[in-house]
Structure formats: structure tokens, C-alpha cells
Amino acid sequence: MAAASGYTDLREKLKSMTSRDNYKAGSREAAAAAAAAVAAAAAAAAAAEPYAAPGVKRKYPEDSDPERSDFEEQQLQKEEEARKVKSGIRQMRLFSQDECAKIEARIDEVVSRAEKGLYNEHTVDRAPLRNKYFFGEGYTYGAQLQKRGPGQERLYPPGDVDEIPEWVHQLVIQKLVEHRVIPEGFVNSAVINDYQPGGCIVSHVDPIHIFERPIVSVSFFSDSALCFGCKFQFKPIRVSEPVLSLPVRRGSVTVLSGYAADEITHCIRPQDIKERRAVIILRKTRLDAPRLETKSLSSSVLPPSYASDRLSGNNRDPALKPKRSHRKADPDAAHRPRILEMDKEENRRSVLLPAHRRAGRFSSENYRRKSYEPGEDCSEAAGSPARKVKMRRH
């Protein structure tokens, strides 16, 4: 049998079979080692490029991913801007609970006197969910000017607003002087902003050509927040995320200067006024601040020659709009949506829409009286105090 299989004896056949088994085992071990090496290489590649799909070569390395890089850049810019804002802010808690209560009682007296009509016309400025009371110096802003925008604000003539109440000097200003927050004699303008829940003030910069720096404010009645770098949208009102949200506590003093006062807007958001809140803003007007040269305006219609009578050298001050009524708002006024300047502009534009785009609630008589040819200046009937609105071509 051994001869038929080609082996001379059984020992040679056993030796031959052992050699083949060793060869096969070695081949299997080599194949396993090779497979392990390939798997290790793939794992290393996946670790190096975690966002790459299998078998797809990345076009950009991770560090140069455009979307990721843009997001990180925006975050870095926001953090840098927040750092600049913080560099221009000082905060301190100076007023105790008892001191706050005394000052808040005085603020209530101001509100009561205003409701009785005991202040000058330009001392009080009313808006839904927010009233302002100017003392020492007052100025025109926002809807009060026909020509709007930064740099158009003007101080009222001397005497058009009431003097700073003595209690503001004794209870507020003197304490700030004692703690060296402001120097003696710095303040000549005090404004009290009185907010109801949901009230707000849109993003703005205190007029640089009107007021010196710093700007000092003291908070009363409740806690809130002062936000920097927000953008407002209206109908419904919405506010973007701030660059910095600064908590302001009852009895705290906030001092703005530098970048925080001049290079970025600040605002009070509606969601940050959960309870009644008041703030006393103390400032100093610039010696070269522009001022209206005429006496206070009444709510009557201005004569056509009014503008020519208000020349001061080569400068013409923009005419004031008639002031709002000083009647007390009805009880439901605080619960209606706040009417802001962008809303008013949209309402004016809606009057000028063609017939097929107007709502059916407008009568033909109203349409006849409020329809004009494009490009013309339009106003109400003679004798109306309404401001002229220039139509836009669409």
C-alpha cells in the first residue's frame, strides 16, 4: 500500500503530511495578520477624518471646513465684542431696601403730579407701557422730528422742562457723589423711565452730540436686564439674541462709558420687564449740544412761515411734530400691542395701496380722500395737524 501511494514506507508519508499542515497553518496566520493590518489602517484613517464617508476622499481638511470655520469665527467675534462691552460697564449696589422704598415713593409722587397736569408740556412723554419724565434738560427724539435719524436730536429751550426735583439731588445724586461715581455738579439732566410689565425701549445709543459720558442709571421697584446689540422686529415684536445681557437689580447703579456707551446699542426687552420697573438716568449735556431756539410748541397747527422763523445762523432745526394728548390712557391700553414707529410707517403706507389691494373695510369715501397720484406729497385737508408723507414709487 505504501508503494502504491509513492512512498517507500509509512514514515515518509507521515513526514510529508506534517509539512503540508504546517504550510497551511502558516498561510492562515499570514492572511489573518494582513487583514488585521488593513483594519488598523482603516481605523487610523477614520480617526483622522471622522466626518468623511467611507470610500470618499475629503475635499477639505477638518480645520478648513467653511461652515464650521464661519460659525467659530462668529462666536469668536461675539465673545470679543462682549468683552469690549464689559470693559465699558461698572456696576455697584449702593441703595438699601429702605432707601429704595423712599425713592420709589417719590417716583409715585412724580407720576401723580403728571396725571394732574402739574408739569410743563415737554416734561412728560407718554407711550404704551412706558412713561418718561424729563427734568433739567429734555430733548427731541424719534417720532417728534420730521427728519429722523442719529444726530437729529435737539435740546429743548431752557425752561421747557421742569427743574430736577430736590429729592433727586438729596436721595440719589448726593449718594453717587459720596461714592465717587460722579463728580460734584456733573448732573444737569435727570430722566425717570417708568415701565409697566411688557414695556420696552428699542435699541439705541444715547445721542453722542447731546450727552457727555458716563451715563449713570439707578434701578427701582424690580429686577430687570439691560441688553446690548439686539435687533428688533415688529408685528409681532421680536428681539434677537443680545451680545450681552446685563442683570440690573433693584437698588443697583449701572455706569456706561467707552464701547458700551458709544459703539453698541442697548435696549430693554419686553420679556425682561415682568413687574413694574423704574430707572433714573443721570447725565450731563454737552456745552455745544444743539438746541431749539424757539419756545415750546403748542399742539395747534404750525403756520407755513414757522420753519423760516426758526433759522439759527446757517442751521435750520427740524420742526417738531404736534405732541400727543396728555389724557390718561383707558384701562385696556396696557394690554393692547405696543404701537411703534415701524408700525406707524406701515399704517401710512397701507393707506396708499391701490383699490384692489386694500381691505374691504375701507369705504369709498375714505379711499377717495386718501388716494393720490404717485410722486406727490400727500396730506390731509387744510387745517389738519397731520404730518405730510411723501409717497414712494413701487
From Swiss-Prot:
- Cross-link (Glycyl lysine isopeptide (Lys-Gly) (interchain with G-Cter in SUMO2)) at which positions? K328
Main localisation: nucleus
Asked if the Swiss-Prot or TrEMBL record annotates the protein with the keyword Zinc, the reply is no
- N-acetylalanine found at: A2
Compartments annotated for it: namely: Nucleus speckle
**Active site as annotated:** Y139
Q: Which reaction does it catalyse?
A: an N(6)-methyladenosine in mRNA + 2-oxoglutarate + O2 = an adenosine in mRNA + formaldehyde + succinate + CO2
Q: Which residues bind 2-oxoglutarate?
A: N193, Y195, H204, H266, R277
Cofactor notes:
Binds 1 Fe(2+) ion per subunit.
InterPro entries for the chain: AlkB-like (IPR027450), AlkB-like_sf (IPR037151), ALKBH5 (IPR032860)
Q: Where is this region: Disordered?
A: 1-26, 48-83, 298-394
The entry describes its oligomerization and partners as: Monomer. Interacts with RBM33; promoting desumoylation by SENP1 and recruitment to N(6)-methyladenosine-containing mRNAs. Interacts (when acetylated by KAT8) with PSPC1; interaction facilitates recognition of N(6)-methyladenosine (m6A) mRNA.
Matching PANTHER family: RNA DEMETHYLASE ALKBH5 (PTHR32074:SF2)
Protein name (record): RNA demethylase ALKBH5
Instruction: Print the organism lineage.
Output: Eukaryota, Metazoa, Chordata, Craniata, Vertebrata
Q: What is the primary gene name for this protein?
A: ALKBH5
